[in-house]
């Protein structure tokens, strides 16, 4: 057993060593890869630091200028918007005020006209009514003329009729002549009536027109009042909006001013933060490089230690594999040592894996920083393009400066003629040189590494020129008398400077060539950028396709997993059904076990009762045997009283112990009681003889010597049989005690199984039934377990053993009952030959 265990442990140790070796190889490969990646990352970081330092210096000024320009443009836009809003508001206000003044004038005119119409007469009202009243007057005049024409026609007709009537009256005589004045008399009355009616009608019409005009004037006045109220409300709203706009303008102006100040402060803070960040990044990079170098040294040392430990372990394993079969105990000790060393190696491996994880995290952090720096690098490349454009502009400015310098040389030649012009040109040159110095300083800060030593020389020369010019100006201001001599020296210097400027022009041409080369490099970078963008797009498309494929695969896998889940659920249902069947079988087995236990208890009770009866019978038989021995001794001592033997047998037949044995027999000796009853029924005359000596039948006077010898022989045989029975009873007691012990032991085993199963199941689930052997099986044996068949076999074996033991107990009980019956028969049997001769006699 120890040898098998040591071989298993040896195999396990070999497997662990192989795993450690593979892990070591993997770790060494990962370390090599990480080292290569770190070197590439360091190179990238160094290159990016250089580019970052270049671009940051260029950004520090370009950003400020751009942000200031943006803020100024925003401020100008806001001011323009405010001015436009103010102009719009002024125009709206002026139009509203003009409309309001017009409405007020119209209202005043209408009120005056209304008062005049109310106060004035009808004619004046008609005269002042306007074009409508004039139209009515024309209509009325036309009607009046028409009426006059009608009246004229009527008068003519009336005149004709009057002429006819006068002719008739002349023909008839004088009497009708008196009627003429009566007919002509009503004519002026009719004319007066007509005029009166016409005037009346005209007055009525004028009155109606006046009422209509008053109603229209009232409606117009109400409408104008409503419009006035609306316009006043609009005016109030416009004034409120104007005040609001004024306040908003002030707030916007203040906000823009505050924003400009905040942005300037933020620029300064950002500049400081960027400087601090760059310093911090440089420090972190230096610390990371140092830590990487230290980790590399540690890793190399640990790798060497690992290799040495692995070699030592391999040597030990080879030695142990050679001597494993011969030295088992030594292998066990070495296995323990190897376990400790393996534990230490596992700890070292865990530490190394942790360190590797830390390194991976650091590499991921560095990769993230690299991505950020790459993004910043891309921004800087865009800014670099802007700076290149600015560089071209600066080169153009340099060309212009060269032209200006040539012009300055010509002006310097004319300085001897005109001192005042020289002063003015010197001042102009000073201002232009200041601007040139500022531009050159900006270019110096922006293109420090690109232009290099040539630009430094150029800037030094420009600064020297500026210093010389300033010095010359100071000398001109200090001493006017020596200006001519100094100007002559300056002319000589200017000639030399023109030569230097020619050399500078050559350098500028070289710089232009460099700029052209930079433009070519820029085009190459742009092409590379386009290629990178195309590759990025292709990679994105590939990633999208891969994502689609992964999603499709995931959907297919999900479908497969769902089908597998359905199959597993079906299997679980089948297992549940099998579990229910097993639980049913376990419950039936539990019931059977309970029945067998109850039967065993009943049999134990019966066996204990039978043992008690047998012990009682043995005790009584011993007493009887003692009495019989005493009687036999008495008979042997008194050979004359042979008839006492017969009395003894009869008294034994009728003794209370005999009746007690018959009454106190067990359930298993039921046949023995029946036999005793038969014997008692057959031995009634013997009882009567022993109970009443007066009514005894005549007995034989003496027994023969042969009969006495037979009796002694029978007594000896009965005594031997009694001893045999006692030995059998003792054997049965021992076997029953062993059976009781076996039963107690098995019940204790079952109780221990039950307790263990209860403890195990109480941890898992506290609501299961734990009573009996069925609960034990239900708790220990779950459906689908591989040990179910073994447990069933064990239970079957236990049941078979219990059944066989029960069968043996039944057989032993039957044997005991048969022995008891036989003993009772033998005990009852000896008096029969005595009774037979008595009956015969």
Swiss-Prot record:
InterPro entries membership: GRIPAP1
Biased composition regions of type Low complexity, renumbered to the chain: 682-694
Modified residues (Phosphoserine): 655, 666, 668-669, 688, 690-692
Disordered: region residues: 532-551, 558-580, 681-706
Record PTM text: Proteolytically cleaved by caspase-3. A minor C-terminal proteolytic fragment of 30 kDa is produced. Proteolytic cleavage is required for JNK signaling activation.
Its biological purpose: Regulates the endosomal recycling back to the neuronal plasma membrane, possibly by connecting early and late recycling endosomal domains and promoting segregation of recycling endosomes from early endosomal membranes. Involved in the localization of recycling endosomes to dendritic spines, thereby playing a role in the maintenance of dendritic spine morphology. Required for the activity-induced AMPA receptor recycling to dendrite membranes and for long-term potentiation and synaptic plasticity.
Other comments on record: Antibodies against GRIPAP1 have been found in sera of a patient who developed Raynaud's syndrome and telangiectasias.
Protein name as annotated: GRIP1-associated protein 1
């Amino acid at each position: 057993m120890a040898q098998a265990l040591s071989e298993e442990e040896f195999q396990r140790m070999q497997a662990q060593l192989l795993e450690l070796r593979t892990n070591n190889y993997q770790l060494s490969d990962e370390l090599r890869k990480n080292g290569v990646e770190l070197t590439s990352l360091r190179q990238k970081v160094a290159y990016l630091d250089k580019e970052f330092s270049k671009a940051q210096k260029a950004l520090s000024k370009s950003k400020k200028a751009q942000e200031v320009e943006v803020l100024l443009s925003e401020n100008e836009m806001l001011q323009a918007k405010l001015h436009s809003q103010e102009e719009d508001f002024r125009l709206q206000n002026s139009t509203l005020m003009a409309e309001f003044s017009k409405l007020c004038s119209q209202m005043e005119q209408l009120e005056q006209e209304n008062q005049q119409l109310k106060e004035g007469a009808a004619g004046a009202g008609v005269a002042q009514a306007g074009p409508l009243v004039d139209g009515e007057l024309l209509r009325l005049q036309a009607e009046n003329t028409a009426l006059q024409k009608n009246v004229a026609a009527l008068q003519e007709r009336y005149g004709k009729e009057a002429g006819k009537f006068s002719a008739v009256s002349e023909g008839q005589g004088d009497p009708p002549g008196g009627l003429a004045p009566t007919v002509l008399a009503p004519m002026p009355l009719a004319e007066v009536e007509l005029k009166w009616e016409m005037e009346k009608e005209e007055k009525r019409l004028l009155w109606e027109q006046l009422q209509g005009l008053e109603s229209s004037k009232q409606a117009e006045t109400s409408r104008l009042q409503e419009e006035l109220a609306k316009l006043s409300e609009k005016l109030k709203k416009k004034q409120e909006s104007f005040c609001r706009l004024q306040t908003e303008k002030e707030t916007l102006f203040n906000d823009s001013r505050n924003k400009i100040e905040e942005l300037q402060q933020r620029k300064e803070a950002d500049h400081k933060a960027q400087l601090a960040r760059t310093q911090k990044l440089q420090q972190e990079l230096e610390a990371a490089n140092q830590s990487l170098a230290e980790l590399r040294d540690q890793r190399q040392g640990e790798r060497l230690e690992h290799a040495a430990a692995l070699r030592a372990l391999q040597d030990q394993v080879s030695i142990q594999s050679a001597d494993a079969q011969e030295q088992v105990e030594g292998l066990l000790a070495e296995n323990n040592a190897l376990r400790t060393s393996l534990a230490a190696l596992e700890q070292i491996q865990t530490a190394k894996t942790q360190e590797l994880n830390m390194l991976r995290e650091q590499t991921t952090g560095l990769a993230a920083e690299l991505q950020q720096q790459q993004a910043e690098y891309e921004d800087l490349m865009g800014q670099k393009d802007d700076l290149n454009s600015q560089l071209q502009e600066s080169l153009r400015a340099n060309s212009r400066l060269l032209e200006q310098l040539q012009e300055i040389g010509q002006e310097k030649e004319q300085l001897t003629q005109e001192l005042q012009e020289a002063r003015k040109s010197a001042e102009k040159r000073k201002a232009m040189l200041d601007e040139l110095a500022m531009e050159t300083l900006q270019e110096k800060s922006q293109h420090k590494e690109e232009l290099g030593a040539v630009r430094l020389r150029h800037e030094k020369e420009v600064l020297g020129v500026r210093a010389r010019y300033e010095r010359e100006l100071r000398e001109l201001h200090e001493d006017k008398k020596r200006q001519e001599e100094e100007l002559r020296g300056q002319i000589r210097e200017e000639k030399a400077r023109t030569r230097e400027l020619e050399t500078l022009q050559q350098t500028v041409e070289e710089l232009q060539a460099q700029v052209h080369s930079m433009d070519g490099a820029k085009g190459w970078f742009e092409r590379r950028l386009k290629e990178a963008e195309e590759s990025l797009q292709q990679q994105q498309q590939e990633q999208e396709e891969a994502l689609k494929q992964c999603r499709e695969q995931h959907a297919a896998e999900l479908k497969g997993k769902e089908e597998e889940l359905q199959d597993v659920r079906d299997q679980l249902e089948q297992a549940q059904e099998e579990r229910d069947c097993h639980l049913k079988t376990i419950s039936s087995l539990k019931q059977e076990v309970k029945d067998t236990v109850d039967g065993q208890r009943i049999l134990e009770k019966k066996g204990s009762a039978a043992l008690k009866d047998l012990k009682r019978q043995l005790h009584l038989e011993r007493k009887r045997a003692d009495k019989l021995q005493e009687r036999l001794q008495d008979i042997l001592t008194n050979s004359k009283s042979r008839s006492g033997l017969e009395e003894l047998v009869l008294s034994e037949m009728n003794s209370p112990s005999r009746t007690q044995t018959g009454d106190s027999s067990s359930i298993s000796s039921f046949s023995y009681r029946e036999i005793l009853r038969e014997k008692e029924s057959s031995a009634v005359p013997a009882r009567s003889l022993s109970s009443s000596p007066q009514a005894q039948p005549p007995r034989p006077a003496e027994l023969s010597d042969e009969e006495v010898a037979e009796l002694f022989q029978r007594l000896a045989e009965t005594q031997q049989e009694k001893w045999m029975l006692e030995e059998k009873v003792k054997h049965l007691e021992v076997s029953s005690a062993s059976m009781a012990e076996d039963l107690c032991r098995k019940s204790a085993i079952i109780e221990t199984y039950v307790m263990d199963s209860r403890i195990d199941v109480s941890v898992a689930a506290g609501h299961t039934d734990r009573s009996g052997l069925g609960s034990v099986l239900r708790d220990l044996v779950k459906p689908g377990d591989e040990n179910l068949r073994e447990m069933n076999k064990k239970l079957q074996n236990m049941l078979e053993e219990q059944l066989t033991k029960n069968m043996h107990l039944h057989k032993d009980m039957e044997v005991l009952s048969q022995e008891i019956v036989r003993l009772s028969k033998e005990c009852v049997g000896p008096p029969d030959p005595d009774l037979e001769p008595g009956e015969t006699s």
